[in-house]
Each structure stands twice: as structure tokens, then as C-alpha cells.
């Protein structure tokens, strides 16, 4: 009897304990299945989406896999949370912090918008489109030639070629007529994929922030150029000559080198917009002939042409001789100051071999003040001297300082 009881007890224990073993095994398997696996998460993401990191905006972007016609969208916090929930719905354990750690790592390939645009340009079909593009503004041969050169410098800047010769020349579209689409033309030079890197909002008093724009923007429009102050103009000329930048980004302690991308273009409703003759070589002034037609501009082929020309060694910088020609051409766009008008009434430049006086700036101004004292207050000696040289007056360096070779004339001549 005891033997029978013992047998029944063993059988009962076996039936009671077996489910527990099975349940324990099942629980263990579920724990393994529910354990976070970065590889499963990455496989899911790479199977369903494309990711990339924009090195200019420092923003992650994504789009559905295989949807090449769709543009990439910014991957913000809301999109990141939606992705996390989607992965969890697919039965894959995922925490938002783990997903963010992956997305914000070097495992996501980075890209440069301008480099990518140039790489994806079509082959040039051989048709010259730069003449037509320039002629939409003016058919003047001078403008057509140098606008082409400037466009080469613009693309060279985007391609990273312009490290020695910064694109330090800016076209200025001038028209006293309103509504001739000067600003629209400037913006239409920016390809659609790069429109985010065009701006006409510029504050020349914001030093560091403005230099930062040179490393991010592709084209900066100096809209209403004639409103710039003298201080702003000096700052602008300095910025235009920078070929490389040293920028400290937000939340970083150290400065880092940054290549310059930006080129400048500008518009004006006034013709007398330049006040520094020696610095005018930085501005390619053109008077707009008519309302600009901004339709049907084939930018892919225009930039494909420029790319092909650069790859065959076409020069993209302006020579000193070309800068001198630009400076001479810009005489029609100078501001004429009172002291210059008065000077022309009483002096002229001496001809070669002609008897003349050798006068200093102070001596010239003393003569003018005797006759027109009230009109000659706060005259800038430097600007006045530069204006004389720009107008053709010969300047001679002597032991007593600079002297100007002049002949006196009557105001009525």
C-alpha cells in the first residue's frame, strides 16, 4: 500500500511540475525575443528607408526606400517618434533613445548639397546658353563676357575649386525703373534643389553670423545695394575677399576651418551707387536694358556647361587687367561728391610734358576752401585722393609726401 501511495505521489508531482518547466522555457524564449537588438532595428530601417546627413544644415533627412521621385524630408523629433512606433508595431523591440543614437551616428552617410548637385548634373549638350542668360539683362559685350566669367567663379566656389581665388566680384543690376525683375533674376540663378541656400537677408553689422553664411549659402543677394552705409561697404569688401573661414559653431568651444561657398550678387534702383573708385573693381555694374525675362532658364544645362568648361581648364578668376577694365567701366556709376565737382571747376590733370603745379591734397583743399569754404566740411582726405587718381590725375611720391600734377583753370572754361 505504501509503495502504491509513493508511486501516485511521484506521478502527481510529475504532472504538476511539467507545465512549470514548459512555462519557464516559454518565458525564457519570450525574453530573448523581446530583448533589444540593434541589428534587427537597422535591418528594418535600411529595408524601408533611406537616410542621409546634411553637413551644411547639420540635419538628418529621410525618405521611403525606392521612392526616388520623392524628395528627402527633415527627420525631426516627431518623425523620429513615428519611426520608433512603426518599428515596435513590426514586432521589433525599440527604444526612442536607441533609434536616435543610430540616426545621429556616423553610420548614417553624410552628403554636401552643392557637391551632390554638381555630381548629378547631366552631360552638357554643347549648346552655349550663357550668352542668352546674360543678354536677358543686357546685350552689352562687356557684360556678357564678364558675367560668364563670374558664373564660372560661382560654380568653382560650389565645387571647392576657388580656394586660392575667392569669388570677390559681385554683379550689380542697376535700373531706376521699378518692377524689372532684378531680384527675381538673381534668385532664378539658384537651382531648385539649392533654393534653401539663397538669401537676400543680410545684416552687415552681424560679424560672426555673416561669416557663417559664407560657409552655408550658395548665393547672397545684396538687394537695394545703394542703401549700404560706408561702414557696411567696407565690411562687405573684406568679406568678398575671404577664400576660407574660421568659424566657431554653436555649442562648440574651438574655431574650425570652413570652406567658403557663397558668392554675391546685387541690385540697385540708383545709378550713382559707388563711392570708392579704387574698390569699384569688386563690382560688375550693368544697367538693365529692359524688363528681365526670367522664364524657361535651363539651369541644369547652364551649370553642366560651366562644369564642362571648368573641367577643361577654363579660367574662373579675373585678371588684374580685367579688374582695371571693370574699374574704368564703373566710372558711370560713381557718386560725385561736392569736393570733386569743385575740383573740376578749378583744376585739371596735367598733360604729359605740360608745365604744371605739384600740389598736395591739403594745398588743393586750401585753394578750394578759399572759394567754397562752406561746401567743404568733413571732407575725407583718403577718399578725395583716391577720387583724383581714379579721374586720371597723376600722383607722384616725393620726400614731402604725395603730390598731384595739376593745371589751374577758370571756373568758366
Regions found by a protein language model. Name each.
Residues 252, 290-294, 356-413:
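Positively charged interface segments
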Amino acid at each position: 500500500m505504501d509503495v502504491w501511495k509513493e508511486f501516485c505521489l511521484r506521478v502527481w508531482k510529475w504532472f504538476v511540475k511539467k507545465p512549470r518547466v514548459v512555462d519557464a522555457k516559454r518565458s525564457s524564449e519570450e525574453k530573448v525575443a523581446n530583448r533589444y537588438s540593434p541589428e534587427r532595428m537597422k535591418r528594418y530601417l535600411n529595408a524601408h528607408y533611406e537616410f542621409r546627413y546634411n553637413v551644411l544644415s547639420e540635419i538628418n533627412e529621410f525618405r521611403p526606400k525606392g521612392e526616388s521621385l520623392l524628395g528627402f524630408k527633415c527627420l525631426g523629433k516627431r518623425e523620429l517618434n513615428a519611426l520608433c512606433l512603426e518599428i515596435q508595431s513590426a514586432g521589433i523591440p525599440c527604444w526612442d533613445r536607441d533609434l536616435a543614437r543610430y540616426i545621429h551616428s556616423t553610420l548614417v552617410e553624410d552628403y554636401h548639397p552643392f557637391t551632390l548637385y554638381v555630381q548629378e548634373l547631366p552631360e552638357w549638350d554643347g549648346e552655349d546658353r550663357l550668352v542668352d542668360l546674360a543678354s536677358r539683362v543686357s546685350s552689352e559685350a562687356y557684360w556678357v563676357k564678364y558675367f560668364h566669367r563670374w558664373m564660372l567663379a560661382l560654380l568653382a566656389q560650389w565645387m571647392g575649386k576657388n580656394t586660392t581665388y575667392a569669388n570677390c566680384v559681385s554683379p550689380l543690376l542697376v535700373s531706376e525703373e521699378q518692377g524689372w525683375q532684378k531680384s527675381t533674376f538673381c534668385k532664378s540663378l539658384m537651382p531648385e534643389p539649392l533654393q534653401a541656400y539663397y538669401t537676400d537677408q543680410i545684416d552687415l553689422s552681424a560679424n560672426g553670423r555673416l561669416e557663417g553664411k559664407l560657409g552655408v549659402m550658395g548665393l547672397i543677394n545684396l538687394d537695394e545695394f545703394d542703401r549700404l552705409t560706408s561702414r557696411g561697404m567696407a565690411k562687405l569688401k573684406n568679406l568678398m575677399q575671404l577664400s576660407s573661414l574660421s568659424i566657431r559653431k554653436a555649442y562648440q568651444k574651438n574655431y574650425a576651418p570652413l570652406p567658403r561657398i557663397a558668392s554675391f550678387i546685387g541690385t540697385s534702383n540708383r545709378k550713382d551707387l559707388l563711392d570708392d573708385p579704387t574698390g569699384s573693381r569688386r563690382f560688375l555694374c550693368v544697367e538693365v536694358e529692359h524688363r528681365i525675362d526670367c522664364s524657361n532658364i535651363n539651369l541644369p544645362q547652364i551649370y553642366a556647361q560651366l562644369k564642362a568648361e571648368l573641367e577643361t581648364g577654363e579660367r574662373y578668376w579675373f585678371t588684374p587687367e580685367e579688374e582695371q577694365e571693370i574699374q574704368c567701366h564703373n566710372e558711370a556709376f560713381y557718386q560725385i561728391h561736392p569736393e570733386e565737382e569743385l575740383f573740376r571747376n578749378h583744376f585739371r590733370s596735367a598733360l604729359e610734358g605740360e608745365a604744371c603745379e605739384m600740389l598736395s591734397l591739403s594745398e588743393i583743399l586750401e585753394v578750394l576752401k578759399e572759394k567754397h569754404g562752406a561746401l567743404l566740411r568733413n571732407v575725407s582726405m583718403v577718399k578725395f585722393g583716391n577720387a583724383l587718381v581714379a579721374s586720371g590725375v597723376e600722383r607722384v611720391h616725393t620726400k614731402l609726401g604725395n603730390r598731384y600734377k595739376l593745371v589751374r583753370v577758370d571756373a568758366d572754361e
